[in-house]
């Protein structure tokens, strides 16, 4: 009977026996035949069942629910049940009735559905299969696909079938390896795109008579293992050279070989058996991923490692092996052993370009869409490759782009879980319709394709209506976007989440925020308009995407006197960009004054303390690639530091002591210096404040602030330009031309005016008020106190730092004294005013006083405090009386 069966039908019989063994049954029934038809994949029967949404997983589940699992003991020969025999006989008759003198998978399926009873029919009924429709579908396929019916098996498929029939000649290898060729036949491997050159190089090495062992060398994630998988797919598709016909690729699992080797010699014995089996079977090509692990594997005291066991076989040409490892590991483990290195022929696998990566992602898109049950927009696929290449610096294409695309799908899928059940059902129906439509077009079934297009439009209309209802329902709070599609914005959000770099599109709120950036920074930094404008322009340029992508966002030198806000502007910028001023990377360059301390920036060299700890600058930027880097007091650093900065400022990159390239392209480099302070002081005519200087402030009758005419810092634009040129000249004398030439802008800071100090005093008072608010206390400072603080804290040479000392001495110390001398409760008001001179109306002393107001305090707290005070007094009296007695 079986002589008329096609190779596909024979495979169905063999697969049905395998299914019986898997389920622990000693018979092959109609249900196992059904599973064999589905598992055959290439046959018409499998295609017809797939069209009816019948999958191997669903069918197995239903069958196991119906008949359960067997005892587990299965004989070597598994007989057919009477019903299964009858079905196979009916399959022969089905072929004759259709005028065909052979039996294919379609005839077996026709016989199965002709059998009115049986587990197979009940399973199909449970899965909702329309039997008449299925029969018509099979007949249509038979009529239109005569070539497919008679499709001969490839050499590799024949070889796999023969191995299954005769039994494997490599039992040890089968136990400790995975069959890549079988996965290729089953369609489990991802498509390999853009690796034709590398696959061709591997084939050339395999064609050699001796030392025919290619080793794929490349960075992690560039697709070394994919080259081996691509070769397996070429062999299966019969597109490889003739000498590879029928060859199988087996991936060796070194970990499982090592596992369980309790006694000396067990590991060596396993390796020897595998070598013998591969040498005896010329069709086997061994694939060893991470081949450097062979060196030292299993080498206990006095034993031989796996690499030395394999050396003789690798040189003879009968043991073909494809290895894969990274460049560093090849250099570290393989190259140091010349005898092992000469047995391998390196094949370098380079990182693909962005264009090739996009092609790879487009090839993988269907796999991700099937897994995540959604669709990917073409722009999202392109952006995944472009943004991953641009912003993820420490990994390689295509691996990082694939991970971005996968996580974007996962992100959208998780968001879709919040959708109503009806929407999920419609989205699933749309995915199924799109897949069926593509299959119909491939099979030239245009009538069904037209019906599916109409159904697709109907489903999309329902989805659009439901989306509109969701968007109008504010309680769900869903964003207005395509909820069934991964868009480029989703990819940008994944990149932003990984790196902290805002690469997504600028929202309306962020656009307004960027346009008003100067106003926001002016609220914190007083009197330095030119510096704020320059920094704001750089931020806007970077956020919109107009800056040079191969350089840092911007690089500045802040030059000017001490205490005028150079470091404060950097803190304000960090708080504006990241919400926290501690987010910036700050390095005090006075710590790098000596030559040997320069190494701390990039990490100590080998042999020195802290070699593996990384550099203070490089490690910080590696952790936070989007940040503000402040090099404070840069003129105090050793000159060799500036040599390190040249590469950062020009190319946005720096190599650390471990050889890693750190990406500085998304950092803003700010260097502060006090060079030029003397020039600014001289040109503006400012002199240090002395004790003989009279207070410049006066209060008029209405209580408004005024001041006496005194020398002012630079206000004239022509004078400011002159001072800027002089400061630049001094910087040129100190720094080398190649360093200054790489700086985007040198910003000269002004001296602070009296009014600037007045404004800064207000900011300091607000900070103190905020600290007291945390203790539920209210601070009210009289304008006369603010005048006093400004008078005491104003010094044109030393900037705002004397003001901080004045606030600490006159205000904070006085408040601390009052807080300790009198009880303070939540709601207490502290009023600070200036002590007036006796007998005058508007003259004040340099002393301040604090009045405590309990009017807003909860009366119950005051009562409890009074009771406690009386109780303490009573206890004190009693103690005194006891002492006297």
Curated annotation (Swiss-Prot):
Segments of this protein annotated with the region Repeat 1: 5-70
One GO BP annotation of this record: cellular response to heat
InterPro entries assigned to the protein according to its UniProt record, in alphabetical order: AAA+_ATPase, ATPase_AAA_core, Clp_ATPase_C, Clp_N_dom_sf, Clp_R_dom, ClpA/B, ClpA/B_CS1, ClpA/B_CS2
GO molecular function, one term: ATP binding
Localisation per UniProt entry: Plastid, Chloroplast
Family to which the UniProt record says this protein belongs: Belongs to the ClpA/ClpB family.
Protein's recorded name: ATP-dependent Clp protease ATP-binding subunit ClpA homolog
Protein source organism: Trieres chinensis (Marine centric diatom)
